[in-house]
Amino acid sequence: MDGFYPTNLKNAVIYAALILILLFVYGIFGSIYIMHLGVIDAIYYTITTVTTTGFGDIRPITPSQKLFTASLELIGAGFLLYIFTLMLSVMFMSFSEYVTGAKLKRKIASMKNHFILCGFGRVGSTAFKELKKRKQKVVIIEKNKDLVETELWSDPNIIAIPGDATKENVLRYAGIERAKCIIIATGSDVDNLFITIEAKELNPKIWIVARASERENISRLKKAGANRIISPEFSGGKDIYFAAMEPLMMKITVKHGMESIKREAEIIFKHNCTLENIMYHLPEFREPLKRKIEVSDLDHIEKFLFQVKKNPRLRESLNKMYESTSGVHSHWISGPSKENLEKVVEDLKKEGILLGVNLDDEKIKEITRKYGMLAEVMVKPEITVVNKHGIDEIRDEAEIILKHGCTIEDIEYYIPGFREPLKRHVGADSIEDIDKFLNTLKKDPKKYDAIDRLYMLSGGGIHSHVISARSLESLNKVEKELKEKGFLIGVNMSLGEIKEMIQKSGTVVDILVQHDVKNLEDKKTVVKYGGRILTSKHYLPGIRYVLTRKLNLKTMEDVKKCEKELEKPRARRTLTALYELSANIHSHTIVTPSAEITKKIEEELKEKGILLGVNFPEEKIWEMVEKEAVEPFCVD
């Protein structure tokens, strides 16, 4: 590893050499031009005068010669004193550096499961502060020797190495084989890449967090072995810290009252862990309320509890928060090792307050619904309402929500075949916003049809809104009136519950039929019962291609338009070919007002001999088509 030689010592040696050269130039030229000596005698006279060892064989006679000789002797004596002082400094600093280096080496050799931080710039120094706050052991490697010697070494609690982290011997000196994590935060992506490769080779199990200044280098660092890559463009030192601590963090979900706050903290701090935050899981809220804590000693908790005791308003607010969740809340905690975290879990279990470890949001919501009670808290509450109505009743629904001072935040449609709902931001807090939207629909028939189709596809008008309000009372009133109006299906339902309900409702189904192109009985039957045909799908064998036609038939007038369309020769030829290629088998996606009506449509189509089945899987449809198709459709 590079030696620890201060820059000012090197400068002193350079200055001494320059002074010596200038002194000799002055002495030699003065001896030639003032003492009138030859070159050899001038060199001899300069050396003997500067070193004060003159033998008296050459003596100054004139005043100018005497002044020159005196100045040369004075400068020489000063220079010799400077050289003597410099030698003492070198000896002292060499001894000091030996002692410092030995101490540093012993300290690092005794460390294990520590962090190595490469680079102590803006990002690195912030990450270091977060690590020290949590009492983590850190070795810093910094290229800038001045920074290490003047700033970092001034604090006896900081272990820092002046050196290049891209070099193997420097990483070994920092104890890379025994470290649990290396944070690579230098300003050079090239250096960061080399350090990542070197670190992975020296310790394949080490957790690597690397900084990437350029977006295109993120994938390179990932391939090189970095577990997490942080870009200062989007994040900072704190994010690097949390990425570094990821393997040593755990989410605990607990249940206890205010009286057990101190006891819970004692258990966590006893094992040298840090309380990073607290999350309150209110039953009526989509996301938990989060608050940073970032403490690792009991003094902070005791100060907080003293403030709670002293301040009635704070005590009342906190008490309501605990009441509203029945004491259910979560913490992210970090620790020096997995063993420490496991000990915390064991002790919390013994205390009888632990509900689970690293539970996902859905699981915590289940627990919250089980234990949680509604209570007014000093935040803006929100709920998700699942409603069912047609496009013509949008204003009626909005009036109920908005008249109680609530805001419609968004709308979600649940389309069959889609894993996630289609979500659209609304942000309406006045009826004028709704009227403006409805006027746009009236002026634009295409937009109206598109929204109408969405409503029909989404379980015949089933959709959800997140609505927010100033108080829970307002939300309760909205819930009650939506229920009375017949719009409300449920509150805060999960995606699985909504999809299951749509499936059971039987209002959106795919019917598989078989008939020739002139037969429109399937269309007439669906429309007659108030249903709607959204699409028609034809299955072309050979290439196994599904051709989908948008129909959107909702009245007998629409069916008559289909009949007129068939009278046109080109349209008739195209549709006839399509029907024949798929053996007259095709499917329709239909929407009906209720499951009962869907059943009636199915029964009538069966009687007419054209219904093959409902909601068949596509593979089964292909089997039927390919079995019946006389000439498979193919392209040369």
Curated annotation (Swiss-Prot):
UniProt-recorded name of the protein: Uncharacterized protein Mfer_0534
Gene3D superfamilies: 1.10.287.70, 3H domain, NAD(P)-binding Rossmann-like Domain
A Pfam family of this chain: Ion_trans_2
This protein's UniProt keywords: Cell membrane, Membrane, Transmembrane, Transmembrane helix
GO biological process, one term: potassium ion transport
Domain of life: Archaea
InterPro entries linked to this entry: 3H_dom_sf, 3H_domain, K_chnl_dom, NAD(P)-bd_dom_sf, RCK_N, Trk_Ktr_HKT_K-transport
Annotated coiled-coil segments of the chain: none
Transmembrane segment boundaries: 12-32, 34-54, 75-95
Compartments, as annotated in UniProt: Cell membrane
GO CC annotations on file: plasma membrane
GO function terms (MF aspect): small molecule binding
Bilayer topology term: Multi-pass membrane protein
Domain RCK N-terminal: 112-231
